[in-house]
Amino acid sequence: MAQNETVTLECIRKEIGDENLPVKGVMFGGDGAVGKTSMYLYYFLEKKEPKYIPVKVETDYGPKIYTYKKTGEKVGIYYDDHEGGGEDWDRLRHLGYERADVVVLCFSIGSRKSFDNIEEYWYPFVQKHASKAPIVLCGTQTDMRTDQFYLDRLAEHNQKPITNVEGKKLAQKIKAVGYFECSSVEGRGVKELFDAAAEATHPDITKTKSEECSVM
């Protein structure tokens, strides 16, 4: 473990108030403007935010103390987000992924490009820099499936929202340990996603499965 990472973990333990507590990291990845920051606001502050909120290149969230459901063990979880910014940020971004215990890859239900980029860019990036970390796949902004404004905008480009079936197939293709859908606007599925990511940091996570958190 690098010295700067050791210092970071020590600081996290002090912030939590338990210097002996195990610490695990969850990295959120995906294109910009898919709703990652809105998810954080809802999860940490219970604040619904329908607008796009730009974030810095790297933003950390947490830490939070989490109790594993199966074992009852406590662990400190910290969350990182390296905003989508293209290949120019690869050198900076890979440092965060290399120390991640779990990676959550996010795409917007209303953006075919962000969906395609999971397989074309983000999954290869994770395989290169965090190959041992379990992946959780998340389709965000599910409210776009029923929002006529967004449906009309997609129709102008002969597009439709990403379906649940498409999301599950992609999860299987990238060997994700889980597939979830959520909406920060409606407040659905966010807590379940964060809980699943925390659970996936447990070392007993060994097999691939695809599951859905219903948000309809």
Task: Label each residue range with its predicted role.
Residues T206-M216:
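Extreme C-terminal disordered tails of eukaryotic proteins encode short linear targeting/docking signals used
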